[in-house]
Amino acid sequence: VRLTRAFYIATREVTNTQYRAFQPNHTSGAEKYQQLAAGSHPAVMLSWQDAAAYCNWLSDQEKRPRAYAAIGGQLVLATPLTSGYRLPTEAEWAWAARYNGGGGSRRYPWGDAMPPPAGAGNYADRTAQGVVANVLADYSDGYTVTAPVGSFSPSPLGLFDLGGNVAEWVNDRYTVYPAGGALAVDPTGPADGQYHVIRGSGWRHSGISELRLSYRDFGDSGRLDVGFRIARTTDDKER
């Protein structure tokens, strides 16, 4: 993959307080009596469509062109791309998450080796025993479910929670990419498909494969461990 298009990406996941400015009655729910609805915690129990609708609403607040168009009752990425708020593409998310400076990349959010060091992020840890089935037995982050966004150390680019806290919706529809495929330039995902890609790990994850920054999941409805962050393409005045 090659990225040639400049973009902004939020340093933090969208919080309950921020999402409720758009949908005041939204609740992020609870897991085994553990509440996920605190204002500073990431907004969850949102479908991909809910996340895209928030992006359009935020664009409206700043009088930017909407990034998503309504077609057949569903929001889809507008073409050509606008400078409105949207979800990061999968390629943008992956580049931002794996960036390690000096041309290198990371295997895990904290570096290249297991286990995570103290304070690495909010994962399924000893604190979450009894709430999730599998935990990192020798790790404790102090949070049973979600944590306030930005509670742990940022990435080299200054981005928080690209691993841990909640997994995140990205723009692209889900597909299985063949190994050794042609170079993709600024990809935005397949044009069709029921499911969208989810990237990153969260408070329910403890497995080696789940904690890797290459981990991909997919879905179309809200989950207690999936939120989102916003991005947008730069406009001509910002380049």
What would you call each of these model-derived segments?
Residues R2, E31-Q34, Q74-V76:
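Short, flexible, solvent-exposed loop/turn segments with mixed acidic/basic and small polar residues
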Residues A6, A113, W203, T233-D236:
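Short loop segments at secondary-structure junctions
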Residues A10, N16-A21, W95, P117, ...:
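Short, solvent-exposed loop/turn elements at domain surfaces
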